[in-house]
A protein has these predicted regions:
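A ligand-binding cleft/hinge motif common to bilobed small-molecule-binding domains
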Residues: 128-141, 263-274
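Short helix-initiation/N-cap motifs at beta->coil->alpha
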Residues: 41-43, 96-112, 238-250
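Proline-aspartate-enriched helix->loop->beta-strand connector
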Residues: 110-127, 145, 249-264
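A short, structured surface patch at a secondary-structure boundary
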Residues: 62-117, 121-128, 233
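Sec-dependent N-terminal signal peptides of Gram-positive bacterial secreted proteins and lipoproteins
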Residues: 2-24
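Extracytoplasmic substrate-binding proteins
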Residues: 45, 121, 134-213, 234-235, ...
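Bacterial Sec-exported substrate-binding components of ABC uptake systems
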Residues: 20-64, 172-205
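Alpha-helical, coiled-coil/dimerization segments enriched in small aliphatic residues
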Residues: 103, 214-244
Length: 274
């Protein structure tokens, strides 16, 4: 009898943590709420809450695009703001939990932290990768949270804000941004079309701690170079849309002789500016 009681006690002890884990993983943002179906940029039909109050960005790009119209809806951040970014982050979001990002050279998604933040929807914004539909399906299956992809290259940015406005019921905030983007892009296209080839400057867009991680021709991060009528000095054999860009050597920089070198602060620019 004592052995049976002990066995039953041990079984209960083993079941308790499993039940707790199942409850945590079983968070269902669609339970007991009105829902609707949207079609995302990957062609996936996704059931989402009709009234969304908590959003998780998939990474730094999604976080940046969401911030102007939905900072107060963020359930967490893909990454904490840097010292340089801090002044541009509303105080309400600076101390939100971080759960990492899906893609890029800094991919570090913490699935448990993401679920703990209890978002009602996960939104991925950026370039349309070949695997995007499968990626979104996988994340949605693993988390149990509706996951949508919105294409947000430079050409699609206005449409991306309109789709965000629809999903988050914030069309009134999204539409002015969409119109501003359309106006700015059109102005840049018209001005660059007037530039003769002889006046188009070659540009090296360097990032990272050394400035040698370049946003090369064909990458979504470098679209703005083409938009303004410049020529990307770095033309790689294989285009990288990862956050780290395409790494080049100093010898390659010397070889292409760019007219202009663009560097971000916090890296070699600070050293050169001294």
């Amino acid at each position: 009898m004592k052995q049976r009681i002990l066995a039953l006690f041990l079984a209960l002890c083993l079941c308790l943590p499993l039940a707790a884990c199942g409850k945590k993983q079983g968070y269902d943002p669609l339970e007991g709420v009105q829902t609707r179906v949207v079609t995302d940029s990957a062609g996936r039909q996704v059931e989402i809450p009709a009234d969304i109050r908590r959003v998780a960005p998939s990474g730094s790009t999604a976080q940046m695009i969401l911030m102007p119209i939905a900072y107060d809806l963020l359930a967490g951040l893909s990454s904490s703001p840097s010292t340089a970014q801090m002044p541009y982050f509303p105080e309400e979001v600076r101390d939100l939990p971080t759960f990492g990002q899906f893609y890029g050279s800094k991919a570090n998604l913490n699935m448990e932290s993401l679920i703990d933040a209890r978002p009602q929807i996960i939104i991925d914004l950026g370039d349309k990768k070949d695997s995007i539909a499968d990626d979104m399906d996988r994340i949605q299956k693993q988390t149990g949270i509706p996951t949508v992809f919105i294409e947000a290259d430079l050409d699609d940015m206005a449409a991306a804000y309109r789709m965000l406005g629809d999903i988050l019921n914030r069309a009134g905030m999204a539409e002015p941004l969409a119109q501003f983007i359309e106006k700015s892009v059109t102005m840049a296209q018209e001005n660059s079309a007037k530039l003769p080839e002889s006046q188009r400057l070659s540009v090296l867009f360097g990032t990272g701690s050394t400035g040698l991680a370049c946003n090369a021709a064909g990458s979504v991060q470098a679209d703005v170079i083409d938009l303004v009528g410049a020529v990307n000095a770095i033309i790689p054999e294989e285009v990288s849309n990862r956050g780290g860009g395409s790494t080049v050597s100093l010898e390659e920089v010397y070889a292409v002789q760019p007219d202009v070198i663009l560097l971000s602060t916090g890296g070699p620019y600070d050293t050169l500016a001294q």
